[in-house]
């Protein structure tokens, strides 16, 4: 085997939140994800009944999943890991649902979560996320100072809009994002601008932001390929959220088709991965003497 990319779809992103139309049934959502060619899904593991139903479907169709959780303390990770032991998962995606003011207050939490993951033999990735321990870029960089080997899931949309990087993004800010990406073992996909956390990749006026994120994701993939084992799997979760993440017009309708945007993102990232893999293959291919 060789290193592989697996593109997943967020089930949260399948929510429509329309006032005059019902939500898609769960089985419809899962069938859409399968038929669209995704490799799996992001699954909330805080609800055992929900997680069991979803993973049963995904497993029956040869798909994978990440186990998502939102612990407020160390012990809240334990039932998630117990459920992972029963149902399996590629990894646990942990959103630390705490907002310490002091970096020192994070130490026992990070140490505890990592210890539990190691004891269970499960990879635990800490997500960079709004309104969590990792909500601020500089605070998260300080975490990396304390835990240089901390495994992150990179959702960098929050950092672009949170710090409102000047445009074009300068090398200093690129360097800060690159440091996050150098610790990332998974990616959550959403394209932001410096003022909006989620924009459609299809609008002409957004192409500069699309290119920015494709460049960051290229850096992330190349960094991961250097660090990961020869048979490792990188997951990329398409996570285009429903309103109010998605921008709506005066009629309450979204300005773009978010499902179609996710399909476009899936194909863009797979093409990016293939280009990088092809380039790496040419660089490592043995030279034939003439």
Locate predicted features:
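Acidic/histidine-rich catalytic cores of soluble enzymes
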Residues: 119-204
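A short, acidic, amphipathic alpha-helical segment used as a generic capping/interface helix at domain edges
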Residues: 172-175, 209-233
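Flexible glycine/acidic-rich beta-alpha junction loops that bind and position SAM and/or redox cofactors
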Residues: 10, 16-17, 161-164, 191-205, ...
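Hydrophobic faces of well-ordered beta-strands that scaffold small-molecule active sites
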Residues: 3-16, 41-43, 63-69, 92-94, ...
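Active-site-proximal loop/turn and secondary-structure-junction residues that shape catalytic pockets
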Residues: 13, 47, 71-73, 96-100, ...
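N-terminal pre-domain/capping segments
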Residues: 1-85, 89, 267-276, 280-290
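Short, low-complexity, polybasic intrinsically disordered segments
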Residues: 247-280
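Active-site acidic/histidine proton-transfer and metal-coordination neighborhood
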Residues: 64-152
